[in-house]
């Protein structure tokens, strides 16, 4: 049996210099050979964008630590298909994000997108986020990350497995819960201002946070129970519950056919 250390790819969306990334690297370094490929600047809420219409550049910051002038998904793509193509990582981890990636956050999250790109490319992946807005203490999350990654490395994981992990901030978590994705809202705020030349500009976002009380959800685990949420995600976005609703539709001027295999 080979004693070669297991290769772990680390990325994020906050940038290669971020405190959360450093905490995650320090947490998992004893478990294998760590390679960091992360954005060269803040890329929060970049979602799963990839750069198809401009060239990308890679800068080696130090040994096995690279900065990419692209999105989080670009980083995962370049790492797996170029930098590490001859010896692919056995696991990818992303984070630790400076803020939550709960509920609908996953649709916008660059942290989750980096991990998702890894999973799409056949490398099982885990995204880690610290649910806090200030006074980031990454130590509890780093301890959980080390334990979870150690467990993941000790067993064969499905190639496209993707886990989204959220750690409550400001507390020592009371264990963890395997959860479903919840639902929440930030208030859909639009702030309008005017620049010195009289032109309007806008900030979007919102600070009126509310989440729904959904049993078994990631939001309930983190906010109500102060526990780490571990949510398995997948790429199948079909709303199967709506398929029967569409069965009676008829689009004028076009024949309706049954799907293959129905």
Swiss-Prot record:
EC class of this enzyme? Answer: hydrolase
- Which residues of the sequence carry a binding annotation for a divalent metal cation? 13-14, 44, 97
Q: Show the catalytic activity.
A: a ribonucleoside 5'-phosphate + H2O = a ribonucleoside + phosphate
Drop me one GO molecular function for this one.
Answer: metal ion binding
Q: Name one Pfam family in it.
A: SurE
Keywords, comma-separated and alphabetical: Cytoplasm, Hydrolase, Metal-binding, Nucleotide-binding
Localization, UniProt = Cytoplasm
On the tree of life, the source organism's domain of life is: Bacteria
Q: Name one GO cellular component term.
A: cytoplasm
Q: Which residues are connected by disulfide bridges in this protein?
A: none
Predominant location: cytoplasm
Cofactor dependence: a divalent metal cation
UniProt xrefs under InterPro entries: SurE, SurE-like_Pase/nucleotidase, SurE-like_sf
Note on how the cofactor is bound: Binds 1 divalent metal cation per subunit.
Q: What is its EC number?
A: 3.1.3.5
Q: Entry's SUPFAM superfamilies? A: SurE-like
Matching NCBIfam families = PRK00346.1-4, surE
Job of this protein: Nucleotidase that shows phosphatase activity on nucleoside 5'-monophosphates.
PANTHER family on file: 5'-NUCLEOTIDASE SURE, 5'_3'-NUCLEOTIDASE SURE
**Similarity remark:** Belongs to the SurE nucleotidase family.
Q: What is this protein called?
A: 5'-nucleotidase SurE
Name of the gene encoding the protein in the UniProt record: surE
């Amino acid at each position: 049996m080979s004693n070669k250390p297991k290769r772990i790819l680390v990325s994020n969306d906050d940038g290669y210099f971020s405190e959360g990334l450093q905490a995650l690297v320090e947490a998992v370094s004893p478990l294998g050979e760590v390679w960091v490929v992360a954005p060269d600047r803040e890329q929060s809420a970049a979602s799963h964008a990839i750069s198809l219409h401009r060239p990308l550049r890679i800068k080696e910051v130090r040994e096995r630590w690279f900065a990419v002038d692209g999105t989080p998904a670009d980083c995962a793509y370049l790492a797996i298909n170029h930098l590490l193509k001859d010896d692919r990582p056995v696991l990818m981890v992303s984070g630790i994000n400076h803020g939550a990636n709960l509920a609908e956050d996953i649709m916008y999250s660059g942290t989750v997108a980096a991990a998702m790109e890894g999973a799409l490319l056949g490398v099982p992946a885990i995204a880690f986020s610290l649910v806090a807005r200030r006074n980031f203490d990454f130590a509890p999350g780093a301890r959980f990350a080390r334990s979870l990654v150690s467990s993941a490395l000790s067993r064969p994981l499905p190639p496209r497995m993707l886990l989204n992990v959220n750690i409550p901030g400001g507390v020592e978590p009371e264990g963890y819960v395997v959860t479903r994705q919840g639902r929440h809202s930030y208030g859909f705020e639009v702030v309008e201002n005017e620049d010195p030349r009289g032109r309007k500009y806008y900030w979007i976002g919102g600070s009126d946070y509310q989440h729904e009380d959904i049993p078994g959800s990631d939001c309930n685990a983190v906010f109500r129970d102060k526990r780490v949420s571990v949510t398995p995600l997948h790429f199948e976005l079909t709303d199967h519950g709506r398929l029967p609703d569409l069965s009676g539709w008829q689009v004028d001027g076009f024949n309706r056919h049954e799907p293959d295999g129905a």
